[in-house]
A protein has these predicted regions:
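N-terminal nucleic-acid-engaging modules of covalent nucleotidyltransferase systems
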Residues: 1-156
Length: 157
């Protein structure tokens, strides 16, 4: 049941499927482009020792970017939809990011899990999350903001 909810975010659909088709029906529910899915979040540990106790050895360790989590969905018709960790559609606020994904990621239909990070065009250095968060809620002046505060996308495996 949890898996069905994670890939639909629709309690009503999960309940209806469970009632009509039972466990077999729930197991048949799968991800669909355009419908955001719950994102897997990193486990927090106080020490490296605690981290290894939690996940075991060997373990893959990735750099922590100070950006925001993004899901990029491509629907098979060259439409890109971007969702935040809270499952909000932010495609309009990040046309540059949507365009980048469309031009650089091959595939007819997909869902990518990534971190979008703002950077300073002059220095190439990453900007803190607080800077890029201005773009998330932006409704006007998006083109100018895209020029002043570009973002790059770091895709998770």
């Amino acid at each position: 049941m949890q898996h069905a909810y994670d890939v639909t975010n629709e309690f009503a659909e999960v309940a209806k499927t469970a009632k009509l088709k039972g466990l077999e029906g729930l197991e048949s529910i799968s991800m669909k482009t355009g419908i955001p899915i719950q994102m897997m979040l990193a486990l927090k540990c106080d020490t490296i020792e605690e981290a290894f106790e939690t996940v075991g050895k060997p373990a893959a360790i990735e750099f922590k970017y100070d950006g925001f989590r993004i899901q990029a969905h491509k629907d098979g018709k060259n439409n890109i939809i971007l969702f935040t960790r809270r499952l909000e559609d932010v495609t309009n606020q990040f046309p540059d990011l949507a365009d980048f994904v469309l031009k650089n990621v091959k595939g007819r239909s997909f869902i990518l899990d990534a971190e979008a990070v703002g950077y300073d065009k002059k220095t190439g250095k990453y900007l803190p999350f607080q800077s890029i968060s201005q773009r998330i809620k932006r409704k006007y002046g998006i083109e100018k903001m895209s020029e002043e505060m570009p973002v790059e996308v770091n895709v998770f495996d």
